[in-house]
Curated annotation (Swiss-Prot):
Annotated GO MF terms: proton-transporting ATP synthase activity, rotational mechanism
Membrane topology category: Multi-pass membrane protein
Quaternary structure (record): F-type ATPases have 2 components, CF(1) - the catalytic core - and CF(0) - the membrane proton channel. CF(1) has five subunits: alpha(3), beta(3), gamma(1), delta(1), epsilon(1). CF(0) has four main subunits: a, b, b' and c.
Keyword line: ATP synthesis, CF(0), Hydrogen ion transport, Ion transport, Membrane, Thylakoid, Transmembrane, Transmembrane helix, Transport
Originating species: Prochlorococcus marinus (strain MIT 9313)
Name of the protein this chain belongs to: ATP synthase subunit a
InterPro entries: ATP_syn_F0_a_bact/chloroplast (IPR045082), ATP_synth_F0_asu (IPR000568), ATP_synth_F0_asu_AS (IPR023011), F0_ATP_A_sf (IPR035908)
Protein family according to the UniProt entry: Belongs to the ATPase A chain family.
Pfam families: ATP-synt_A
């Protein structure tokens, strides 16, 4: 991917530039690791604050956490089914929270004020490596869900309703993580690019409505990713007759 500089300090955006950490023979994207750990720290802090002093009549952060718990529980129950959803609620909830906080952090936190030797900080989900890793994690999870619940009977899925479907089902196993990863990556990166370009062209008020639209889109993308992950797991544990 090429190099795209936008000269204004508060609107600077560099696509394809990374801060690399060398660990053995591996090159890691340092800025993605930094922002990912910041996101994880923010989620952990939210949980600690919300559960430190539990009350029967919740308010504040505890009320927010209970709302999220109920919402994720309903989502998992609807997509996975009554029998198996409890086992997968923590996974679906963690996915949703990580993506949601990452997306909103990319829109609300002024990462570009923090200067790096190379590249710049931004939403972890605006990096293709993060979204591919999340999508592969979902793929491994629904394979595990199917095999752990059905054993070798899981592979009946590939011949249901007819063996003619085998090549299509195999192709589907590759397209699921691709669609998950590129949908999330494309939307979040496009949102950051649009806001940066508008700030460069009209730096005062025009970008504000676009930023609010970006927040809405970011929340929807987190919901779509979590819903599809739950749906794929539900599809894997579903009994075929």
């Amino acid at each position: 991917m090429g190099f795209l500089p936008i000269a204004l300090p508060f609107a600077e955006l560099e696509v394809g530039q990374h801060l690399y950490w060398q660990i053995g023979n591996l090159q890691l994207h340092g800025q993605v690791f930094m922002t990912s750990w910041i996101v994880i720290g923010a989620i952990l802090a939210l949980v600690v604050v919300g559960t430190r002093k539990m009350e029967r009549d919740p308010h504040g952060v505890q009320n927010l956490l209970e709302f999220l718990w109920d919402y994720i529980r309903d989502l998992a129950r609807t997509q996975i089914g009554e029998k198996a959803y409890r086992d997968w609620m923590p996974f679906i909830g963690t996915l949703f929270l990580f993506i949601f906080v990452s997306n909103w952090g990319g829109s609300l936190v002024p990462w570009k004020l923090i200067h790096l030797p190379s590249g710049e900080l931004g939403a972890p989900t605006a990096d293709i490596n993060t979204t591919v890793a999340l999508a592969l994690l979902v793929s491994l999870s629904y394979f595990y869900a199917g095999l752990s619940r059905k054993g070798l009977r899981y592979f009946e899925y590939y011949v249901h309703p007819t063996p003619i479907m085998i090549p299509f089902k195999i192709v589907e196993d590759f397209t699921k993580p691709l669609s998950l990863s590129f949908r999330l990556f494309g939307n979040i990166l496009a949102d950051e690019l649009v806001v940066a370009v508008l700030v460069f062209l009209v730096p005062l008020f025009l970008p504000v409505p676009v930023m609010f639209l970006g927040l809405f889109t970011s929340a929807i993308q987190a919901l779509i990713f979590a819903t599809l992950a739950a749906y794929y797991i539900g599809e894997a544990v579903e009994e075929h007759h």
